[in-house]
């Protein structure tokens, strides 16, 4: 679930913020594009130098969030979620579960008939087969 939420949020961020339509430019117009780019760069430098730090704070900023799946383990004291949940239940509960499993061997609720098995080749694979 964590991976799907992360991948969905990453996809939404890519589609909403980073979507820029691209167009092919003929080779003859490359000189014009370079001239326009130089003009744009010079205008942006002038605009940045004229703006004070106070006016920059008023603008909206983009926040990029990068997450690592190993980070969740570090946040939960190095334990995955299911182990953290078992640890929160307490050590007594974990021990009683082991005792219950050991007690089930003495009185099984489902009878299991064990037979001597032999290996028979079926096709290219050895499968268990029983003597009659």
UniProtKB/Swiss-Prot annotation:
Plays a role in skin pigmentation by antagonizing the action of melanotropin alpha. Induces melanin concentration within the melanophores. May participate in the control of the hypothalamo-pituitary adrenal gland axis by inhibiting the release of ACTH. Belongs to the melanin-concentrating hormone family. It comes from the Eukaryota. Disulfide bonds join 120-129. The gene is mch1. InterPro entries: Prepro-melanin_conc_hormone. GO terms for biological process: chemical synaptic transmission; neuropeptide signaling pathway. Pituitary gland. Produced in neurons of lateral basal hypothalamus which project both to the brain and to the neural lobe of the pituitary gland from where MCH is released. Pfam families: Pro-MCH. Residues 1-24 form the signal peptide. This is Pro-MCH 1. It comes from Oncorhynchus tshawytscha. Keywords: Cleavage on pair of basic residues, Disulfide bond, Hormone, Neuropeptide, Signal. One of its GO terms (cellular component) is synapse. GO terms for molecular function: melanin-concentrating hormone activity; type 1 melanin-concentrating hormone receptor binding.
């Amino acid at each position: 679930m964590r991976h799907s939420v992360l991948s969905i949020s990453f996809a939404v961020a890519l589609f909403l913020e980073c979507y820029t339509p691209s167009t092919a430019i003929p080779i003859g117009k490359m000189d014009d594009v370079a001239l326009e780019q130089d003009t744009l760069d010079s205008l942006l430098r002038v605009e940045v130098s004229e703006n004070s730090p106070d006016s920059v704070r008023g603008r909206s900023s983009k926040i990029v969030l990068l997450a690592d799946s190993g980070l969740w383990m570090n946040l939960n004291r190095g334990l995955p979620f299911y182990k953290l949940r078992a640890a929160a239940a307490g050590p007594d509960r974990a021990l009683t579960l082991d005792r219950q499993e050991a007690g089930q061997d003495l009185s099984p609720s489902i009878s299991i008939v064990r037979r001597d098995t032999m290996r028979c080749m079926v096709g290219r694979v050895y499968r268990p087969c029983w003597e009659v």
